[in-house]
Amino acid sequence: GATDLWVYDLSRDAASRLTFEEGGEDWPVWSSDGRFLYYASDRRNDGTIFRRASDGTGAPEEIATTPQGIWPLAASHDDRWLAIGSVGGSTSTDIQRFDLATRAITPLVETPFLDQDPAISPDDRWIAYASEQSGRWEIYVQALGGERGRWQVSNEGGQRPRWRADGRELYFFIRPDRLMAVDVEPGA
């Protein structure tokens, strides 16, 4: 069905509708500076990501389209690229890098398993994500540049990783009622 995105202004205690198009808009992701919202739309039955000013001014801008599904998942802290989810091809779901300047899509995490919930480190050097490659959801961390080593950081399951603002800790849920934290060595 049709869904739209709304922005709630805490200081004014008021909600403003941001999208008005036919079809559904979902998967909203804030830019790091808060000026934009990126979101997926199914209005044309393809994979399309739009960018819209978070204050509602201007028209939505189509920034990426693919024949298979894509959706935004996280914005880099320098606002130069997005981590996006994708389906299709030879794997289940993957995490891709979408460069906002060149509009190029390149693989970040590509496995034959479900990979989701990416969290980009505050220095934009690492990505944490959940994957079911071990047979259950676990948290992995991978370098973003050059050599792409991958490390499993959970051992009792894990989902929804998030970095502490200074990048020195990674948080994730084992179950909805159990939050875990893993220390991260700066510069590692």
Where do the language-model regions lie?
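Short loop/turn segments that connect beta-strands within beta-propeller blades
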Residues: 9-13, 53-57, 99-103, 143-147, ...
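Structural motif
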Residues: 2-6, 45-51, 90-96, 135-140, ...
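Alpha-helical solenoid scaffolds in eukaryotic macromolecular assemblies
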Residues: 6, 56, 122-125
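C-terminal structured "cap/appendage" subdomains that terminate the fold
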Residues: 166-188
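Acidic, glycine-rich loop-and-beta core segments that form the ion-binding/anion-interacting portion
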Residues: 81-83, 93-100
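Conserved beta-propeller blade repeats
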Residues: 20-42, 61, 66-85, 110-130, ...
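Long hydrophobic segments that form regular secondary structure
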Residues: 98-101, 124-126
